[in-house]
Amino acid sequence: HCGDVPYGYENNYVDDYGLTSRFDIYDALIEKLKAAEPYMYKVGEGGLNGERITRTFVDGLIGKMALYAGGYQTIRTDMPELYGSVQFETLSTDAKRKCAYARRSDYKNYYTIAEDYLQKALSTNAGTTKLVTTDERSYANNPFQRHFQYGMDLLMSPEAIFEIGCVQNQATSRMYCYDFGRGSNGGNNTAPNKVFAGIRMVPSFYYGGYDNADKRRDVSAVV
């Protein structure tokens, strides 16, 4: 049941955590982002590019969460109080797995939010982001590949709204994703050669960092 997880930062002990409705979580996060969004830089403003969280990215994130909140999804039927006053339109149910495939009845409100903020991300708040539709390399003339070549050249593509840097030879005291699960040192003749040939996560903290009874554990890593 993706989404119905413990939520909140004020709890200190495992026993203090219970499940929270995904719809309550969506509503809380959407409202927090909507409050912060007007005060943020767009991509290209304040020296920020797609390696930093910007107003452009937040607009897209609000839109994406609103689509998830209003879309069809599996919901639990074994905890009737979990979703509070939220009403649903149900397509099917599964008594064995105690779930239903449904969407909330007021889904249009969320689709309106999604349309509004996704449009902002693509227009008024797009900043310097743009689709790569041309290729200045006469020998290639492949705009699709040009987008990915920016990454291979250790540059940020103008299409990138937000991404975490994951490249070779970037010295830092912090742990970026290049440090996790790499099968080589990133040399040109050994995969992955520079970026994105194979990014994996080794969730050692998943196995050893949580009490088995801690309900946060299973949603803290993709195994």
Where on the chain are the PLM-derived regions?
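Conserved, well-structured interaction surfaces
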Residues: H1, N12-R55
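Short helix/strand-bridging catalytic loops that position acidic/His residues to coordinate divalent metals
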Residues: E10-G18, G47, D94-R104
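An aromatic- and glycine-enriched ligand-binding surface/loop that stacks and positions planar moieties
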Residues: V5, Y26, K34-A35, R52-D59, ...
